[in-house]
């Protein structure tokens, strides 16, 4: 099962202050949504989401595909439009249909939606697992932090962004002399779900803060609630609205008769390995359209004459040299 690895994302100096450019969050947002559906995250409506878990996992785990999809989604949201279909020799270009018109409406709307959310952010924080999942699920209602620097600027009504994916409203901020005192004053299950004793709770915070700093600055209990609008919900709607055909368009795949809806190309390494291998005779008609501008047509010949293959350095096109 695919999982969202927060450790793979550089941890920003916490808390960051001010609005966040949404373009800097697309990768984390896309990775989070794909990993949630690939792993069937509890609470997600997998019935309403049109992409299969295996499809999401393949996008997530193929570095080249993921990077291409991230860059294309970012560009589309900034420009408010989808690129045209890739040109395929011998296949006439299709006229714009209702699906394409729907994409044209979806992208500028959702791009503006994301921008509004990220512009409204006042403080950006990062949390490790399992605390991020607990905050998203609403079981962790209080975030404990050292009362230093910009943390002291957080007040009731502030909008916080966690891990570039989750927005939380600040309901209240209370200051304590120590984490032990905070865990006594707050309901421990709201601060550290799954931890039953104050002693164990203090041990959790000791992994992040020394006792000396705790005594010097004191600590803050930041009570939070989850607003309805969330960046990950918007990204979820973008992927659902594009579906297999729209995402295929972003990845440079041409839609032809007989195209498998959830088909994705193999990794470049697997493709080159196959092309460089021995070609068996009596091969039927197969058309494979791939990203990275690779299109291979195997002709319906019962006996292929001997040939060699090579890779064009600039275009990445596979060349067939007949002997």
Language-model region placement:
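Mixed-charge, low-complexity intrinsically disordered regions
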Residues: 1-167, 171-322
């Amino acid at each position: 099962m695919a999982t969202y690895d927060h450790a793979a994302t550089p941890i920003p100096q916490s808390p960051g202050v001010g609005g966040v450019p949404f373009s800097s969050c697309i990768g984390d947002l896309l990775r989070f949504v794909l990993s949630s559906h690939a792993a069937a995250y509890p609470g997600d409506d997998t019935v309403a989401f049109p992409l299969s878990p295996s499809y999401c996992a393949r996008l997530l785990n193929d570095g080249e595909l993921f990077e291409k999809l991230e860059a294309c989604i970012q560009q589309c949201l900034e420009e408010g439009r989808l690129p045209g279909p890739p040109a395929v020799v011998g296949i006439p270009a299709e006229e714009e249909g209702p699906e394409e018109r729907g994409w044209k409406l979806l992208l500028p709307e959702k791009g503006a939606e994301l921008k509004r959310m990220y512009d409204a952010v006042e403080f950006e924080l990062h949390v490790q697992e399992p605390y991020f999942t607990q905050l998203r699920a609403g079981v962790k209602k209080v975030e404990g932090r050292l009362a230093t620097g910009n943390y002291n600027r957080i007040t009731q009504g502030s909008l916080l962004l966690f891990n570039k994916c989750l927005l939380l409203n600040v309901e209240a901020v209370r200051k304590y002399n120590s984490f032990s005192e905070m865990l006594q004053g707050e309901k421990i299950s709201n601060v550290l779900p799954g931890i039953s004793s104050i002693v164990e709770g203090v041990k959790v915070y000791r992994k992040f803060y020394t006792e000396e700093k705790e005594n010097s600055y004191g600590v803050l209990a930041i009570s939070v609630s989850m607003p309805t609008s969330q960046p990950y919900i918007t990204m979820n709607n973008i992927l659902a609205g594009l579906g297999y055909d729209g995402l295929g368009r972003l990845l440079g795949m041409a839609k032809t008769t007989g195209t498998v809806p959830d088909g994705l190309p193999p990794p470049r390494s697997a493709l080159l390995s196959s092309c460089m291998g021995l070609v068996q005779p009596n091969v039927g008609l197969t058309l494979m359209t791939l990203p990275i501008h690779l299109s291979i047509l195997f002709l319906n010949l019962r006996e292929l004459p001997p040939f060699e293959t090579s890779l064009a350095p600039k275009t990445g096109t596979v060349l067939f040299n007949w002997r």
